Regions:
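A short, structured beta-strand/loop element
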Residues: 43-58, 106-107
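Generic short beta-strand segments
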Residues: 27-31, 55, 86-88
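Short, exposed beta-strand/loop patches in secreted or surface proteins that constitute
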Residues: 15, 45-48, 69-71, 110-112
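Generic detection of short hydrophobic beta-strand segments and adjacent strand-loop junctions
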Residues: 68-72, 118-121
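Acidic/histidine-rich, surface-exposed loop or edge segments in extracytoplasmic proteins
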Residues: 55-68
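Short, internal acidic amphipathic alpha-helical interface segments
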Residues: 71-109
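Short, well-ordered, aromatic-rich surface patches in folded extracellular/luminal domains
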Residues: 1-37, 94-191
Length: 191
């Protein structure tokens, strides 16, 4: 099972069995509606400093089901850090816990290299709050940053949204850990 170790100051620690530091994490977790079970346990997406993107799924109890990996070019890392630099005026002051005014059917967590992780409950409700409210302000900024990251991944065939993840097999092929991958014509490695 993959584990993230959070270090003081919000920095990512190493992930067990990988040896590379994650620089971005997004986790989606649907909650059970009253009187019913959640359909599934959601998913986690991790981008590592070596350009590997990991997509993991979970069952309704939150237990790990499967993991697929994708190789992204170095340009993705450069663009990602450019997005973080652009967010540096507001991201450090973002509360670690954002909640909408109504109970949510799902929760999300966002983590960016060098910043404390942010848990969001009811992103859609928060986006509807007035711009002058703290929740509305930070939710909008966080959502725009997330959309920018999604657009960056989409350039290489990865389609990610708040509640979904898919890929174009015509543009990118997943692999499993311990399989050989090719990240560039001159680089080869094993995850």
């Amino acid at each position: 099972m993959t584990k993230v170790i959070w270090m003081k100051g919000g920095r990512f620690g190493l992930i067990a069995r990988y040896g590379y530091k994650p620089i971005f994490q997004y986790k989606f977790r649907p909650f059970a509606q009253p009187g019913a079970e959640a359909a599934d346990g959601g998913f986690t997406v991790l981008l590592y400093e070596n350009g590997i993107l990991s997509f993991s799924t979970y069952d309704a109890n939150g237990l790990f089901l499967d993991e697929l990996c994708f190789t992204l070019p170095g340009r993705v890392l450069q663009c990602f850090y450019s997005l973080l630099r652009n967010a540096s005026s507001w991201l450090p002051s973002t509360p670690c816990d954002l909640r909408g005014s109504e109970p949510s059917l799902y929760g999300s967590s966002f983590a960016f290299d060098g910043y404390d992780p942010i848990r969001v409950f009811g992103m859609n409700a928060l986006l509807c709050e007035p711009c002058g409210s703290a929740g509305g302000f930070f939710a909008r900024h966080l959502y725009v940053l997330f959309e920018d990251v999604c657009n960056l991944f989409a350039e290489y065939g990865i389609n990610m949204s708040l509640d979904g993840f898919s890929w174009s097999t015509a543009r990118i092929q997943p692999f499993r850990k311990n399989q050989m991958y090719v990240s560039a014509p001159q680089q080869r490695g094993v995850v």
